[in-house]
Structures are given as C-alpha cells and as structure tokens.
C-alpha cells in the first residue's frame, strides 16, 4: 500500500511571507508550486523549485485564477478560452524555472476556485485537462477524488491522481464542504488522522452528515497555509509509516 503526500507551497509574493515551506517540504513527497496568479512570484517560484529539488520532492504546477487579493479562492466569471490560456501561461512560467534547475514538472493541481470549478463542471474540467495534455501529455493531473477533473482527464488521455484532504470535511456527494461554512476545515489533529487512515486503508470517508462515501486516495493534501499545517504533516507522516504504508511521490 502506498500514497503520496502533497502540499501547496510557494505562496508568498513580494514582501509578503506565507506558510512554513522550509519546515514542511522535508516531510512531503510532492510540492504544488503556486505559479503567480493567485500567489507566488518569479523569485518565490525559483526558490521553491530549488528547495524541492534539494529534498528530492516532486515538483508540480499549482495554477489558479488571477486573484491575488482573494488568494484564488473566489469564483470568477471567466471564459473557457481564458481558462485554457491561464493554464498554459502558468505552466510555462514554472517550466522555465524547472528547466534551469534541471528538474521536470511531474504533475498539475489546479488551485482553489479553479479546482472546485473543475471538480463540479464537466466542461471546465475538460478545458483544464486539455490544456495540461496539450502542454505535456506525460503530466499527472491531480483532482478531487470522484470529480469531473478525474473523469475528464482520463477522457483526454492523461494519467490521474485522485486527491483526498486530511484537513477538510466532505459533503455526502464527495465534494468538499465549502470554506464559507464554519466547520469546513478540520483543526483537531486526532480527527484528521482518523480520516486519513480511513481514506487510505478503506477508500472511504465519513461525510459531515455521517454518511460513508467511497473514494480513491492516491495522494493526500495538507494545506501549507493552515494554522496546524506543520503539525498535521508531521503526524500524518508518522502514522502512515507506523501503519506500514509507503509514502511515495506520484
């Protein structure tokens, strides 16, 4: 049994520091690097790629909507052509830094509202998947388990990784509880660990309404901007190893 452990990193920009990347990155196997639209900038991207390489962590693109103020978590009325182009633009930006540091982009995981839009809307999911395929058909597309991001990525011929969340609660249909709700994020470490083990070992999660939902767990996400992110990552890694589960990149 194996699973990937990923975290969204490189989300500082300019004079604004964000997250504990240097502490978290030695504990994970895949880094989703912000590409400048919702967070990150050219200097942060460069340093994050260098940091990932130094710790033998797989580098992935984390493209988002052009919304620094809202951290890419607000829906934007945007055309399919614009979604396609912003995907290509951000992938190209990260590829430049990967090239000079002689590492390869391994995967792509949309960020925030773009991720949720693709998870719930088949047409948007197809546009995202097609952009990734056109850029590099060997890339892995990471998306919410059981969502349109996964099914549409498979339809266009991409390798997929079904993602589950250690620190998020689920709806009965397998979607994530909206961050607008007060109980959307799990802050209790024991609750998060219990959820992780059930998802990885049983391919199931208990929804907020106490319904058992089936899902595939190829990769576990812990958010680097969370108050308890470092503690979560440390404890999750510890319990996975204790259970004999291999932690490997995608």
From Swiss-Prot:
GO molecular function annotations of the record: 5-oxoprolinase (ATP-hydrolyzing) activity; ATP binding
Reactions catalysed according to its record: 5-oxo-L-proline + ATP + 2 H2O = L-glutamate + ADP + phosphate + H(+)
Gene3D superfamilies cross-referenced by the UniProt entry: Glycoside hydrolase/deacetylase
EC number assigned by the record: 3.5.2.9
Cited HAMAP family: PxpA
Quaternary structure annotation from Swiss-Prot or TrEMBL: Forms a complex composed of PxpA, PxpB and PxpC.
Keywords: ATP-binding, Hydrolase, Nucleotide-binding
Descriptive protein name: 5-oxoprolinase subunit A
Enzyme class: hydrolase
Family: Belongs to the LamB/PxpA family.
Originating gene: pxpA
Biological-process GO terms, alphabetical: carbohydrate metabolic process
Coiled-coil blocks: none
Role of this protein: Catalyzes the cleavage of 5-oxoproline to form L-glutamate coupled to the hydrolysis of ATP to ADP and inorganic phosphate.
Pfam family name, one: LamB_YcsF
